[in-house]
Amino acid sequence: MWLTFNQVARRRRPLAPRRRRWRRRYWXRRRRIPANRRGHRTNRVYRFRFVREFGQVLQKGTGGSQLSFGTDGINIILDDFLDWGTINWRLPFEDYRIRLAKVEMRPLNESWEEWKGFGHNVPIQDNHLEDFFKKTRLDADPLANWDGARKWDLRKGFKRLFKPRPQLSVTDTDAANVTAALWLNNPKSLWIPIMKKSDQNLPSSGTRVKHYGLAFSWPEPTPNQMDYQVKVTIYCEFRQMNLTHLATPK
């Protein structure tokens, strides 16, 4: 007797349900740090923010029909942000680097009806920045065609973020005329030692390394000059805390 497929399927013994196997979860064990590496480590980075404020004067123009321009710039030096005063104290770190800078410029009680105009601001990360310091009576805006230039309104001011770069080609402000390239223990990381061995001077040599910088231009206002408040904020990183730097080195 031949059976159909459906009849054969009914007569087959049903399979027992498969038992589910419960696997024990693997809990990642906490990695234990050796006793000699606990606490402060050499790769720990400390981040600080420093603020500096000062006044900026835009000198007035000649008042004729010919439009004239002025330019100026800002260099970043860590020592300018540290209020040393008369106290002989030092930073308790070995190295530092400036990761970011922010420049804010706002007018002080100026009449918006007297003068209207706009200039440009641009980060310049080499020695060409100093070519624009304290320049007046220019026939054209020298920063208008720079790569990265942004327009700013004289009535409102501006805010600009940029990454400062330490000087590498010209001599440092150190008395020994040490180039800033000698301060860098790794050209990629740009960590700058805060002071040299047996450094007795305050401020320390490392904090005087110059960082470039932001240049800005403006049409010279008429009939009066314009006063601005400039606020510079830098974001620094320090590493290798060393409390022995707080005392005068021998």
From Swiss-Prot:
GO terms for molecular function: DNA binding. It comes from the Viruses. The keyword DNA-binding applies. GO terms for biological process: endocytosis involved in viral entry into host cell; viral capsid assembly; viral penetration into host nucleus; virion attachment to host cell. Keywords: Capsid protein, DNA-binding, Host nucleus, Host-virus interaction, T=1 icosahedral capsid protein, Viral attachment to host cell, Viral penetration into host cytoplasm, Viral penetration into host nucleus, Virion, Virus endocytosis by host, Virus entry into host cell. InterPro entries: Circovirus_capsid, Circovirus_capsid_sf. Residues 9-42 are annotated as: Nuclear localization signals. Disulfide bonds: none annotated. The keyword DNA-binding applies. It is found in: Host nucleus; Virion. GO terms for cellular component: host cell; host cell nucleus; T=1 icosahedral viral capsid. Its main location: host cell. Residues 1-39 are annotated as: DNA-binding. Self-assembles to form the virion icosahedral capsid with a T=1 symmetry. This very small capsid (17 - 22 nm in diameter) allows the virus to be very stable in the environment and resistant to some disinfectants, including detergents. Essential for the initial attachment to heparan sulfate moieties and chondroitin sulfate B of the host cell surface proteoglycans. After attachment, the virus is endocytosed and traffics to the nucleus. The capsid protein binds and transports the viral genome and Rep across the nuclear envelope. Belongs to the circoviridae capsid protein family. This is Probable capsid protein. The gene is Cap.
